[in-house]
């Protein structure tokens, strides 16, 4: 399903992610999120995750035919909460930020959550990403706690 918006001589489209978006996604991850991984790993993860259509949800934003951002959410189910969508990544290329693409991507995820009968959308945002925090608040999200992430690499 596609959403096409024509706004101030810009053609914006929100559509399902596809494998041909791999290089654009890799570049956006590196420049906007700081996760610089290889194209091989990007493609490997996309093959696996795009196939899991009942658990992972991916959409890209195109501006004038070029991938300018994406959102990735997963079904979040726990014993202590009703099901929601959990946004794992929202990334918009730096030169396309502040043009409404992130808002459109989040609205798409909210629509999917509603269509699935879920109670809402949740996400985590890094402590230092103050601009992102301001953005999420501007579109109706509230911060309900602060956390630390613990990580142990085992391989």
Task: Give the ranges of each region predicted by the language model.
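Conserved acetyl-CoA-binding loop-helix of GNAT-fold acetyltransferases
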Residues: 92, 98-111, 138
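Conserved N-terminal entry element of GNAT/NAT acetyltransferase domains
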Residues: 1-20
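Acetyl-CoA-dependent GNAT
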Residues: 16-19, 27-83, 88, 108, ...
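Conserved beta-strand-loop-alpha-helix junction that forms the acyl-donor binding cleft
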Residues: 122-132, 151-154
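Conserved GNAT acetyl-CoA-binding A-motif
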Residues: 106, 113-124
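Conserved active-site alpha-helix within GNAT-family acetyltransferase domains
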Residues: 103, 115, 127-146
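Terminal substrate-recognition subdomain of acyl/acetyltransferases
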Residues: 3, 148-155
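Hydrophobic adenine-recognition pocket in adenosine-nucleotide-binding enzymes
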Residues: 17, 90-92, 125
